[in-house]
């Protein structure tokens, strides 16, 4: 919400560009996604402009040369003291061992919480289906969790066990039900058009059968997605796992096998790998050009996310349900030893507000990251930006004593 002069406050979007002429140069003027923009923020004005514009260059509080020097200094990398969380000071009083133990306990709570969700879902649909739904959701990344989960719920319709479809048919069904099959050929990418035509040859015969559960494309959020995380690629991967039908068996074999600790993450990735896919190994999407080098449908980063959020919690609660204490302890050991995953905006902000941006030796594992996320969920998520009535600072002080 912004207020311009004495005008009434307005609520809407803010677009940032280098210069105001970029509004037309980038096609914003004809893009309906930009119809709610109420302010155009630019570095320099130039020429005419059609909406309220804020030019930044004239309002710098220091010369640009001084700001360039400051940007490379230690001061620029430190988080402003007034923005630190109230827990930052007591957290700094903890030793490295105490901090690691605090994050470890938070990570265990997160593991148990995710495991409980699998347990509750398994009571309704069984362990196998709960795993499939979790894997679909895990590949939805942060923007497309719900549509991916919905596809997981439709597994028995898309891939009936009594009559398993072929890999191509599965890819066509998943992409078709998801609403992600382009209606027209590109007429520019021969390999993409050939594969798309094969998908449609399969899908057009079945689309009426799935009409009641086919999703609109508008459900999917593509903003800011890396090519490797595109839902079309994720569904191509899921089709391979469904076609083989041995996902739970593979994971259970990995869980009970004797593996050197240093190779646990790499062997899980190997267990999840699929045969070569002639199209998807060389394309990011159904519209993309041929890639120069082959790209796996599943990489180490996404495998780590699946491990700590889906696979290990599912295996852990299975061990608990089966009263297999030794297996439960082994799964916990793997969970706490798992290498750290990809950084994200929530973790970055949490490190800045809770630790002042200082390097923390206790954040070198995926479990430590999970522990920090649990702290954010349990405390920061129930307070405000100034930490009103947050109980975490007092808990940390009590921990230190």
Provide a role label for each language-model segment:
Residues 20-22, 45-47, 60-62, 141, ...:
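Short loop/turn segments at secondary-structure transitions that flank enzyme active sites
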Residues 2-13:
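Active-site beta-strand-loop-beta-strand hairpin of nuclease catalytic cores
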Residues 103-371:
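Hydrophobic, aromatic-lined core segments that form the binding pocket/scaffold
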Residues 21-29:
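Active-site-adjacent loop/helix micro-motif of nuclease/hydrolase catalytic cores
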Residues 355-401:
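Acidic, carboxylate-rich catalytic segments that either coordinate divalent cations
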Residues 33, 37-98:
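Compact, glycine/acidic-enriched structural inserts
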Residues 11-19, 40-42:
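Active-site ExK catalytic segment of metal-dependent nucleases
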């Amino acid at each position: 919400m912004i207020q311009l002069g004495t005008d009434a406050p307005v609520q809407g979007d803010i677009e940032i560009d280098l210069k105001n002429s970029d509004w037309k140069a980038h096609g914003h003027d004809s893009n309906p996604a930009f119809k709610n923009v109420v302010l155009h923020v630019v570095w320099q004005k130039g020429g005419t402009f059609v909406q309220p514009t804020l030019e930044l260059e004239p309002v710098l509080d220091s010369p640009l040369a001084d700001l360039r020097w400051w940007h490379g200094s230690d001061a620029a990398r430190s988080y402003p003291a007034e923005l630190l969380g109230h827990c930052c000071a007591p957290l700094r009083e903890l030793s490295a061992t105490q901090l690691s133990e605090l994050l470890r306990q938070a990570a265990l709570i997160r593991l148990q919480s995710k495991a409980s969700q699998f347990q509750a879902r398994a009571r309704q649909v069984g362990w196998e289906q709960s795993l499939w739904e979790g894997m679909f959701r895990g590949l939805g990344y942060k923007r497309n969790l719900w549509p991916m989960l919905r596809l997981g719920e439709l597994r028995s319709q898309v891939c009936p066990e009594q009559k398993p479809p072929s890999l191509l048919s599965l890819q066509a069904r998943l992409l078709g039900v998801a609403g992600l099959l382009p209606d027209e050929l590109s007429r520019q990418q021969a390999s993409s058009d050939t594969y798309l035509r094969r998908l449609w040859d399969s899908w057009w015969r079945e689309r009426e059968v799935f009409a009641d559960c086919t999703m609109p494309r508008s459900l999917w959020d593509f903003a800011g997605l890396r090519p490797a995380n595109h839902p079309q690629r994720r569904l191509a991967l899921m089709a391979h796992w469904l076609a083989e039908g041995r996902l739970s068996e593979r994971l259970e074999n990995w869980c009970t096998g004797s593996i050197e600790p240093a190779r646990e993450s790499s062997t899980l990735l190997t267990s999840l790998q699929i045969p070569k896919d002639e199209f998807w190994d060389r394309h990011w999407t159904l519209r993309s050009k041929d890639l120069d080098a082959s790209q796996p449908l599943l990489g180490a980063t996404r495998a780590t996310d699946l491990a700590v959020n889906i696979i290990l919690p599912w295996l852990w609660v299975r061990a608990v349900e089966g009263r297999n204490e030794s297996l439960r302890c082994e799964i916990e050991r793997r969970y706490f030893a798992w290498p750290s995953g990809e950084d994200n905006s929530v973790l970055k902000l949490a490190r800045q507000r809770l630790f002042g941006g200082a390097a923390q030796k206790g954040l070198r594992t995926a479990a430590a990251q999970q522990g920090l996320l649990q702290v954010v969920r349990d405390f920061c998520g129930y307070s405000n930006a100034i930490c009103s009535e947050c109980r975490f600072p007092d808990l940390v002080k009590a921990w230190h004593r």
